[in-house]
Amino acid sequence: SASGSGESSGMWFGPRL
């Protein structure tokens, strides 16, 4: 649940690059 979209198994990913 951070900037951008692409969360997975707790780990978060910034803006969808």
From Swiss-Prot:
Gene Ontology MF: a single term: neuropeptide hormone activity
In-chain residues carrying the UniProt-annotated modification Leucine amide: 17
Location of this chain's protein in the cell: Secreted
PROSITE patterns attached to this UniProt entry: PYROKININ
Xref: InterPro entries: Pyrokinin_CS
Keyword vocabulary terms for this entry: Amidation, Neuropeptide, Secreted
Swiss-Prot/TrEMBL GO biological process terms: neuropeptide signaling pathway
Record-level GO cellular component terms: extracellular region
Family stated for the protein in its record: Belongs to the pyrokinin family.
Purpose of the protein: Myoactive.
The protein, known as: Pyrokinin-5
